[in-house]
Amino acid sequence: MLEFYGKRFESRLLLGTAQYPSPSILADAVRASLSRIVTVSLRRESGEARAGQDFWALIKALGVAVLPNTAGCHTPREAITTAHMAREVFGTNWIKLEVIGDTDTLQPDPFGLVEAARILCDEGFEVFPYMNDDLIVAERLIEAGCKVLMPWGAPIGSGRGLNNPYALKTMRAHFPDIPLVVDAGIGVPSHAAAAMELGFDAVLINTAVAKAGDPAAMARAFALAVEAGRLAYEADPIEARDMASPSTPLLGKAFL
């Protein structure tokens, strides 16, 4: 069972709530995904007062845990301010911390991220940092107080999948007891399954579901892929080989 900061969840799929064609389609996708955690941007929630209230009512009606994020923040100060606002609005100490360093790739700023994480952890937040796949950055975030890490698979919204599976596999081996979530870049369910097969605890999906032709069907596909990938990891899959290895025994086989 998935566990973040002492809270346990049956689903290992986290779902973002942005970019859906309509609120009803979002609700259908969340239900189809079986996800028990959704991410919410404070900027989206706070747009128009009535629209924000309707959106928040929809999320509460779904009965899911809310993970607010600091999407769009480019400095530690901006991210920290947004985190405090999110805690007031959503009534949770959880925060998905994003400090963007590059506007083209939306790559996280590792220095600003660690700085903001340290301050927020000291202030009682339970931080989910969106990061690259660098082990040293991961070490610093853990030292800052983070008990979850969210390395990217590829740039946000790119749909490229796992750009560097070697780095992700190394991170899993290096931090066997830290919950790891692949966040960003997942495009199709097979990408999610691959992440789970590496031993990651969960994946976070947004664009791949929200922008699909049928978001609810795609959400269900991702739910199945995540489950399949986790089962495969727990089943201890065989190692890849360079040479063939016969699967059919030769004993009793006729030789002509």
Swiss-Prot record:
It catalyses: [ThiS sulfur-carrier protein]-C-terminal-Gly-aminoethanethioate + 2-iminoacetate + 1-deoxy-D-xylulose 5-phosphate = [ThiS sulfur-carrier protein]-C-terminal Gly-Gly + 2-[(2R,5Z)-2-carboxy-4-methylthiazol-5(2H)-ylidene]ethyl phosphate + 2 H2O + H(+). 1-deoxy-D-xylulose 5-phosphate binds at residues 157, 184-185, 206-207. One of its GO terms (cellular component) is cytoplasm. Keywords: Cytoplasm, Schiff base, Thiamine biosynthesis, Transferase. Its main location: cytoplasm. The keyword Nucleotide-binding does not apply. The keyword Ubl conjugation does not apply. The active site is at 96 (schiff-base intermediate with dxp). Its EC number is 2.8.1.10. InterPro entries: Aldolase_TIM (IPR013785), Thiazole_synthase_ThiG (IPR033983), ThiG (IPR008867). One of its GO terms (biological process) is thiamine diphosphate biosynthetic process. GO terms for molecular function: thiazole synthase activity. Catalyzes the rearrangement of 1-deoxy-D-xylulose 5-phosphate (DXP) to produce the thiazole phosphate moiety of thiamine. Sulfur is provided by the thiocarboxylate moiety of the carrier protein ThiS. In vitro, sulfur can be provided by H(2)S. Belongs to the ThiG family. Homotetramer. Forms heterodimers with either ThiH or ThiS. This is Thiazole synthase.
